[in-house]
Curated annotation (Swiss-Prot):
Its EC number is 3.6.4.13. Residues 951-1016 form the Tudor domain. It comes from Anopheles gambiae. The gene is spn-E. GO terms for cellular component: cytoplasm; nucleus. This is Probable ATP-dependent RNA helicase spindle-E. It catalyses: ATP + H2O = ADP + phosphate + H(+). A motif (DEAH box) lies at residues 243-246. One of its GO terms (biological process) is spermatogenesis. Signal peptide: none annotated. InterPro entries: DEAD/DEAH_box_helicase_dom (IPR011545), Helicase-assoc_dom (IPR007502), Helicase_ATP-bd (IPR014001), Helicase_C-like (IPR001650), P-loop_NTPase (IPR027417), SNase_OB-fold_sf (IPR035437), Tudor (IPR002999). It is an enzyme of class 3 (hydrolase). Gene3D superfamilies: 1.20.120.1080, 2.30.30.140, 2.40.50.90, P-loop containing nucleotide triphosphate hydrolases. Belongs to the DEAD box helicase family. DEAH subfamily.
Amino acid sequence: MEDDDVADFFDFSKPFKRTVVSGGYINGAVKPQKLNIQTLPERAHQGTEYAEKFCREEEARLMEGWVDETLNKSTASRLEQVDDMSSVMEEDTQHLQRVRAKELMEPLFSRYNFTVTPNRLTIHQSKQDILKAIRENPVVVLQGMTGCGKTTQVPQYLLEDAYNRKEWCNIVVTQPRKIAASSIARRVAEERNCALGSLVGFKVGLKEMVSEDTRLTYVTTGVLLNKLITSKSISSYTHIILDEVHEREVDMDFLLIIVRRLLATMRNTKIILMSATIESSEFAQYFKIPGPNSLFAPQLAVSNVTQHDVSVYYLEDLEKLRVDFTIKYEQPDVHEKMYFLAAKVAVVCDRFIDEFESASTIDYKPSIIMFLPGINEIERMAEVLRNFLGDSNVNSQEQTKFTILKLHSMLPSEEQALVFTKPSPGYRKVILSTNIAESSITIPDVKFVIDFCLHRVLVADTLNNFTTLRTQWASRNNCIQRAGRCGRVMNGRVYRLVNKHFFEHGMAQSIEPEMVRCPLSNVVLKTKLLDMGPPHTILALAMSPPNLSDVSNTVLQLKELGALLRTAKGVYDLQDGDITYLGNIMSTLPLDIHLAKLVVLGYVFSVLEEAIVIAAGMNVKNIFCQLRTIEALRVKRHFANGSASDGIAILNAYNWWRSIREQGTGGDTTDWCNRYMLDRKSLIEMAELVQEITMRLKTANIRVVSGANNARWTDRERTVVLKVVMAGAFYPNYFIPTCVTDRELSDKMVYTEIGGRDPFSTVFFCGFDHSNYIGPLYRNEIRALLTERKPTSEKHQVKVEFERSTNKIFVQFQYPPDQQSGKSLYEERNSADRVHPGVYEAIKLRQLRHNQSELLVMHHNDAVAYATEHRLGVWRNHEWHPRSVEIPNAHLSVEPPIHWNRVTATVTHVEHPNKFYLRPHDEKNDNIYHDIMEKLNGCDAVLRAFPEGYAFKQRDIVAAPLPNMVTGKMARAKLLQQCLVRGVEHWTVFFMDFGLTAGVSVKSFRQLRGTPLDMFTKFPDRVFLASLAEVQPSAVRSPKDVWMEETIKHFRQLVHGQQFDVEVYSVVNRVTMVVLRHNPDDPIDLTVNRALINSHHAQLSEESYMSKMNHEKRKRVQFEMELDPMYKTQILNDISEQQRFLEDDDVDSLELPRDLLKVRLMLRGPYSPLEVKCSSTVFSGYRKPVIIEKESLNSVLLDTNPQNTHEKLLVAGCVNETSNSRLIARMTTMMPNIPGLPALMTLIFAPTCLVKKDPDETRVVGLLAGLGTDPRTGESMYPEHDMSLAVDIAIDDDDIADINALRYTMDSILHGGHNEQTPMFGEYSIESLMVKVKDYLIKILQRDRPIQDNRSMAHDFSWVKENPSTSTSSQKRLRSTAIDIYTKAIFPLYHNLNLRPMTADRMEFLRQHCKDLHLLTQSRVPLPKGGITCRLCNVTLESDHTLRIHFYSKLHCDLELKINYRR
């Protein structure tokens, strides 16, 4: 910078203008609004027009296969797969087939019953018609309503027909759900009186019950689909029956494509399509095959004759119930008044209709079922029903008694089963259900159906890769199926809460097929395995082809995940790409593609078993029950064990359940699951899925690598690596927890919002008027708001305080000490989280209560009279003054006063590096301490025991024996909490002169008060609480952000009982931040603080705003004391800092009279100053508000390290988008607190990254990650998923080299041979590569990197072409070792950074700038309006006070060190 620029910078008379400087240097206070105006480039939408060409070609190919051949009427007999017929004369072929069929089938004919017993099912009347149509046509469409018997009977008809004709048969029947395939097979086997797995069997995933005798197999759609993709043939079956085709699942539609394509060349297999809807003509048209009478496949309809009448009513039929609202049909949703209408209908059905329509088939009141679109609507409907029945005007005679039951997929199976139970006498079941009861569950006693005619469907936005559960009007077919829930055992009534005209003309006949609205990732992978052309040419042949844009976007997503290469046969193709080994594995797993990648990365990082469990748990229905309660949050946090990860909570819960089930401990697992609020059925399903995934991986030669030198993780490392694996699998679902303001200002607000209290244990309410109400009276009531179901002992650990200058109430949660084991307060806390669990639960309560809590209080006059009568204080000058007690001898306190800079002290007790006690060695304190210990333990000491039955009180001071002392040395002890141990009264005490907390029997107590030693009760503690300054647990060693036991042990051995030179950094909330030196002259690198960091037991930490503020104040006071002797004398004589007051808590024991609590206050909250929100990092989502699903651990998202200025990272397993464009992050994981982790994870796992530098190219300031640019146009390939990150750490060439080595090693493990079917390395090589993966990862995560500030780069989505000449020799060397791996790399390597050193002129300018800023703070010259910018850090400071505090930030200190500036 030129000299005149420097002069201009310090010329404060000129106006300040905040601008954004190009290239990365910006004014730190200016929000990057200009960058935010970047908008996504619009890509042309491509519809289904592309499909017409491919459909014409396919139809022509199909017709050509049939045109020259006359259909063989008896093609059910075929044995091509049994014998080679090539040498036999053509005229003898059929004869030999019949002979061989007889030989193979006759043993089965004699062993099993092939005759169908007639039954009452309606389909039996159509038996001969069905068999005739199947014999004469290659494809038949059979329509029959649910319950007609088509699924169980038609396959048996074919078995019987084969028996009668003595022909070969092999029948397969598909079912959309696993449970249906197995249960139907079991039922058919029972009907045929044969063992399951003999003549009749099933295949579900890898679970099967089949044998050589099996001729009828029920399978899931996916099983048959995978078999046909692998074999590319249908010739092994005589009949393929595709059931429930009307559901139009994506697998079924893709199966139809394959079957139709293979049918053209393999015409001897019969295809039967079975549908439950009346609109089956589209299936017939899809199979255009010449038949005896028509070009289309014939359709057969099974008559649907029922014994009971079902009446249907619409909204206009309910006018007598005062329908006073209008439905906006263009906006599908539940109108609030519809809930009340449905409640009225339910009451009318209960009170009046049953009086003249009694049900004679059952001896209790038949049920009502209501169909609602989702869980939230079910909860609201239940609330309305409860309120409706509780209204005395509506239910005055209490005639209506409902048992309200909920039914949806998130409920545990035990709760779902309640809908089948018989209600209590006089009660009627009202079942509130989603569409789960539409077809999956049948409840026979339903008489009334109340249908809101809505449902939620999954809709995929393939452009942004977000999925949305969208509320839509159900189809008429859906509503007809819902109506079929009644009328089974009695007459029924159906009430549709829409107008009849809208139902008939405004609602679609059938639901939109999944192929056009759901994610296509798995089906596109299957098209690649099918190897019959690019994905879009295959999917064009679907009954309802997806949009070409959706196919293209899905291909991009798969390329982003590494399942496809960017090129197809070496050529870049937007709509195609070669499948990788990773893609091959992903396609074989029954998982979402992100979860499949999680499993494969688990293999790469040597945590395969854990990754399989997490993936399976995320794939099945939630294993946790009652997710929206405090108890559920508590249980889930227990399983998470401080990891802040939904995935790890699933892993721990599953492992614990499995160990109990396998070892038989803990009694019945059902009781255990109930106790820990787990869904046993989901756990069993999860266990089966874990087994299936494991077996599928073994077939792909992927298994846990064993060996003497394999990569092994410690328990603490495993938590970190599992989070890393999830970050890799779920890329780019990255979210940055953000504060509303600047990070430094945010840290300040954390403390100012709660008046300087501990933010990790404090919440606050708003809306309490201290001028009208006496807050201290209602401590118990306020505690009850947050501790409703907690034991009394825990309620006493909740401290309630009031701030009269605001309308706030502060609630502070305290950790109860372990009375029996003598465990320290923090060791209790250390086992959970840094933030008190009560804070999480309080915030969750607010969410559940919709931000309001009700508090009953007295009228003002009543409260003043009551409080005055009980001598609780006095009302004076329009405010309440509670009585208080003064701490005596405050001038004798040993807490470091403001003028202390250094002190010699001994460490008396250690709990961990952030909590230990020091006894200072000055003449006054040493004399007092020795006097106390001598009088208590000297030869002349005679201590009296307390009388029997003495009533001890909290805060009493007694003499008690120190624990673990053989001599029984006595010391002063303050009573904290009472407890009983084996029936004997004990107290948890604090030893005031040692800092130790322990449980002691009252029998050991000795009196001090009222004795010659009474004065010792009036001396303050002789120790003070200390914490190592600028030190926090290592995020790699301590992923839970708490101190590990080995670190505590190491620190205890290092300091306990040792004397140190103690540098006092600050004092905040009676905790002293210190630097420990063995000798006063030791440099900073030889301090205990730095020793822990150098040994990787700890990492550097930013001090909190309060700590930096106190530090700055101390430095300023000490500096002025040196200059002004009078000021020094004043400070030395000032004891106000040590003076403490305690409010009398006796008021807590008073029970307020209920009759006086007449005023209802609605408090807002509770809130925590640590609460943060998230922002998305991808282009398509960074402007959208983000919420975390309520069931997630991180639904209460708190910043556990607000003092740190670096960004944290939250990863989501799945992201949905609501109708109002809000993103919902699901299955979330909070990543370890490692500086720069968002950038590091992106560099490791992104397909490619553009590294952005500052204008001088001296440092990295940002990353742009994604698929990169189209080599033909230079434009972003997938702009919606481009991820922009500011880099807030210093990244250098060493980092890039290690990241490249890690990416190359990962690619080496994942890269396959020529056909990419199996890894090209043997197990020994894989083992050594996995060790390298571990070593590189630990090296990357443990490296200490300076902090920097580059927030301006957070939303810069512009790609800049790189200079190809920057390719490094190391990169070229890696390429030459394995050209094939590099050209087909999933994780291509990065270019070297080639950063330039900072110029001498620039460095000198910054040093002078820092010097000027320091002089400015000492000159007392006010800063200009708008503040001043620290050019070193790019941060604007508004006042000289904030400027001084900024000097102590880690960001500023690191950069001062970088430019060699010495203060």
